[in-house]
């Protein structure tokens, strides 16, 4: 059985956590909770987490499906270098971002999810994983001369493939092949 790539699970968990934090922050801010400023913090932290987690990392084996529009955010995440590619840093960043949001009921679910994502990132870092961007390779065009094996010898229009078959030895010798045969008994059409 193959080895589990923990970073993929952590990425999905952290992205969902960011969206949950944004939602809880909107509820807390719009509902004018007593500590509504923690709701505003949760919105900002959720947006930061979503921007950081939207680009998927490349898998070590197999292929990775790129998210829609990921290539633009990948460039931004690559700029920060080891701050974003090291999963130890991501684990502690997520854990630190989740603490203030834990003091508000509307954002406590996002906090719990982000703490779980942080622990999964820590597990991924312990297993030696790191974030590498998915870079699209240019598509190779087939060589025009390399795809044609043998050019056709007959000019168009060509007869169908069955009609172009070379006659077999039996047909050359006069032995009837699979064509029409003569019925040895005469058949008459009698209508009664």
Swiss-Prot record:
<dbReference type="GO" id="GO:0005768">
    <property type="term" value="C:endosome"/>
</dbReference>
<keyword id="KW-0560">Oxidoreductase</keyword>
<dbReference type="GO" id="GO:1903428">
    <property type="term" value="P:positive regulation of reactive oxygen species biosynthetic process"/>
</dbReference>
<feature type="topological domain" description="Cytoplasmic">
    <location>
        <begin position="54"/>
        <end position="69"/>
    </location>
</feature>
<feature type="modified residue" description="Phosphoserine">
    <location>
        <position position="168"/>
    </location>
</feature>
<feature type="transmembrane region" description="Helical">
    <location>
        <begin position="36"/>
        <end position="53"/>
    </location>
</feature>
<dbReference type="GO" id="GO:0005886">
    <property type="term" value="C:plasma membrane"/>
</dbReference>
<feature type="topological domain" description="Cytoplasmic">
    <location>
        <begin position="127"/>
        <end position="192"/>
    </location>
</feature>
<dbReference type="Pfam" id="PF05038">
    <property type="entry name" value="Cytochrom_B558a"/>
</dbReference>
<dbReference type="GO" id="GO:0046982">
    <property type="term" value="F:protein heterodimerization activity"/>
</dbReference>
<dbReference type="GO" id="GO:0032755">
    <property type="term" value="P:positive regulation of interleukin-6 production"/>
</dbReference>
<keyword id="KW-0597">Phosphoprotein</keyword>
<comment type="subunit">
    <text>Component of the phagocyte NADPH oxidase core complex/cytochrome b558 complex, composed of CYBB (heavy chain (beta)) and CYBA (light chain (alpha)). Component of the phagocyte NADPH oxidase complex composed of an obligatory core heterodimer formed by the membrane proteins CYBA and CYBB and the cytosolic regulatory subunits NCF1/p47-phox, NCF2/p67-phox, NCF4/p40-phox and the small GTPase RAC1 or RAC2. Interacts with NCF1 (via SH3 domain). Interacts with SH3PXD2A. Interacts with DUOX1, DUOX2 and TPO. Interacts with NOX4; this interaction mediates superoxide generation.</text>
</comment>
<dbReference type="GO" id="GO:0017004">
    <property type="term" value="P:cytochrome complex assembly"/>
</dbReference>
<feature type="region of interest" description="Disordered">
    <location>
        <begin position="134"/>
        <end position="192"/>
    </location>
</feature>
<keyword id="KW-0832">Ubl conjugation</keyword>
<dbReference type="GO" id="GO:0051649">
    <property type="term" value="P:establishment of localization in cell"/>
</dbReference>
<dbReference type="GO" id="GO:0020037">
    <property type="term" value="F:heme binding"/>
</dbReference>
<dbReference type="GO" id="GO:0017124">
    <property type="term" value="F:SH3 domain binding"/>
</dbReference>
<keyword id="KW-1017">Isopeptide bond</keyword>
<dbReference type="GO" id="GO:1900426">
    <property type="term" value="P:positive regulation of defense response to bacterium"/>
</dbReference>
<dbReference type="GO" id="GO:0006954">
    <property type="term" value="P:inflammatory response"/>
</dbReference>
<keyword id="KW-0472">Membrane</keyword>
<feature type="transmembrane region" description="Helical">
    <location>
        <begin position="8"/>
        <end position="30"/>
    </location>
</feature>
<feature type="topological domain" description="Cytoplasmic">
    <location>
        <begin position="2"/>
        <end position="7"/>
    </location>
</feature>
<feature type="topological domain" description="Extracellular">
    <location>
        <position position="105"/>
    </location>
</feature>
<dbReference type="GO" id="GO:0045087">
    <property type="term" value="P:innate immune response"/>
</dbReference>
<dbReference type="GO" id="GO:0043020">
    <property type="term" value="C:NADPH oxidase complex"/>
</dbReference>
<dbReference type="GO" id="GO:0070254">
    <property type="term" value="P:mucus secretion"/>
</dbReference>
<feature type="modified residue" description="Phosphothreonine">
    <location>
        <position position="147"/>
    </location>
</feature>
<comment type="function">
    <text>Subunit of NADPH oxidase complexes that is required for the NADPH oxidase activity that generates, in various cell types, superoxide from molecular oxygen utilizing NADPH as an electron donor. Subunit of the phagocyte NADPH oxidase complex that mediates the transfer of electrons from cytosolic NADPH to O2 to produce the superoxide anion (O2(-)). In the activated complex, electrons are first transferred from NADPH to flavin adenine dinucleotide (FAD) and subsequently transferred via two heme molecules to molecular oxygen, producing superoxide through an outer-sphere reaction.</text>
</comment>
<keyword id="KW-0408">Iron</keyword>
<dbReference type="GO" id="GO:0034137">
    <property type="term" value="P:positive regulation of toll-like receptor 2 signaling pathway"/>
</dbReference>
<keyword id="KW-0249">Electron transport</keyword>
<feature type="topological domain" description="Extracellular">
    <location>
        <begin position="31"/>
        <end position="35"/>
    </location>
</feature>
<dbReference type="GO" id="GO:0016175">
    <property type="term" value="F:superoxide-generating NAD(P)H oxidase activity"/>
</dbReference>
<protein>
    <recommendedName>
        <fullName>Cytochrome b-245 light chain</fullName>
    </recommendedName>
</protein>
<feature type="transmembrane region" description="Helical">
    <location>
        <begin position="106"/>
        <end position="126"/>
    </location>
</feature>
<keyword id="KW-0349">Heme</keyword>
<feature type="topological domain" description="Cytoplasmic">
    <location>
        <begin position="81"/>
        <end position="86"/>
    </location>
</feature>
<keyword id="KW-0521">NADP</keyword>
<dbReference type="GO" id="GO:0046872">
    <property type="term" value="F:metal ion binding"/>
</dbReference>
